[in-house]
Regions:
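Hydrophobic alpha-helical transmembrane segments of multi-pass integral membrane proteins
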Residues: 1-213
Length: 213
């Protein structure tokens, strides 16, 4: 159905907002009282404020904000392009894979290695695979446009494309093998994806609200 993909992403993003709030609140609680959840040790889990704060960051940035941005993009870009989303089924299905990738990142923030497997890189790899599927879906949608895409659409496309472009630049330049280069690439991507994505959505929303789409 039209809009099913966008709804799926936004609903799951809302669910991650609840978990992000729980992780962040629990982290702040443990910072105030480190022994508040010591009873969980009998279940084999030792709650740690820093680890829960990391889980809150992953759930907020990748689970909530990223899913909201991508979900909104599945609504905005087809509207601006004067066409339908290339594949609602693809948009719907990959949202669940993205949720799994965020879950892997959250688990990795608590235990980075399980059975000798590094969890965080696995979650990041899964995350990037889903992002490539999202980008392909949006590019196919743009290819079928019936009118010129306004600025909000281009801002959102720039946000989505920033990850693979920066990954290629990092590999070609050799920055991927350097700790400083990895840090810089990560923060440039974060700035581009979140800023351009939110800016595009805000510009579209303000244009619609003012009656000047």
């Amino acid at each position: 159905r039209p809009g099913a993909g966008a709804r799926s992403w936004i609903m799951q993003g809302s669910l991650w907002m609840i978990f992000a709030s729980m992780f962040t609140f629990t982290s702040m609680w443990l910072t105030h009282d480190p022994d508040a959840l010591h009873s969980l040790a009998s279940w084999g889990y030792t709650a740690n404020a820093e680890e829960l704060a990391s889980a809150g960051v992953y759930a907020t940035l990748y689970g909530t904000v990223s899913m909201f941005i991508i979900g909104c993009s599945f609504h905005i870009i087809p509207k601006l392009a004067g066409t339908e989303l290339a594949s609602e089924t693809n948009a719907n299905l990959v949202s669940f894979v993205w949720t799994i990738s965020v879950l892997v990142l959250v688990i990795g923030s608590q235990n980075n290695s399980i059975l000798g497997i590094d969890i965080i890189p696995l979650g990041v790899a899964l995350n990037n695979i889903v992002l490539l599927a999202v980008i392909m879906n949006q590019l196919l949608t743009v290819a079928n446009k019936t009118r010129n895409i306004a600025t909000p659409g281009w801002l959102i496309l720039i946000a989505l494309l920033s990850s693979p472009i920066l990954a290629i630049v990092s590999i070609v330049s050799g920055a991927a093998n350097d700790n400083v280069g990895q840090w810089l690439t990560y923060h440039i991507f974060g700035g581009t994806f979140f800023f351009a994505g939110v800016a595009g959505i805000a510009l579209y929303a303000s244009s619609i609200a003012s009656g000047n789409p």
